[in-house]
């Protein structure tokens, strides 16, 4: 009997000593505007948070149709995971999914596909160009965050920012949604880079 207890204790000690150290930060995918069919339109990045906080996928619906996804770093409010909640407009609402390991909020589709499956009109649009992505972040006035893009002057004219018509929201409405998600304790907005 004592030998059996000793074996169990030694086994437990062996497992405890053999565990890998837990990282102090978690890395998540970051995308502010993802079409469910074609992937991240707004430029894909990554974000880091404390290891006690989750990676998030926030799905924005209009009535029962998925309009877009937001992927990013969540704040430590795990009770909010799997929550459904109405935003600003009676026909828009969100659903939150959380996960607790690096890059667990993976993409729902291949990124930046050149051909779109399904009939035209079912997608938000093609990925934005680098200058459009820069304009997108500037127009949102998010906390001075700019994605890792090659430095160049943002051009006006044919390459200027036009949100995908299938989205059905303005830049101002998107900004309200992102700030709401941040202030409600769901999404951590990236900070300015030095």
UniProtKB/Swiss-Prot annotation:
Residues 1-18 form the signal peptide. The keyword ATP-binding does not apply. This is Lymphocyte antigen 6 complex locus protein G5b. PANTHER family: LYMPHOCYTE ANTIGEN 6 COMPLEX LOCUS PROTEIN G5B. The keyword Disulfide bond applies. It comes from Rattus norvegicus (Rat). InterPro entries: LY6_UPA_recep-like, LY6G5B. N-glycosylated. GO terms for cellular component: external side of plasma membrane; extracellular region; protein-containing complex.
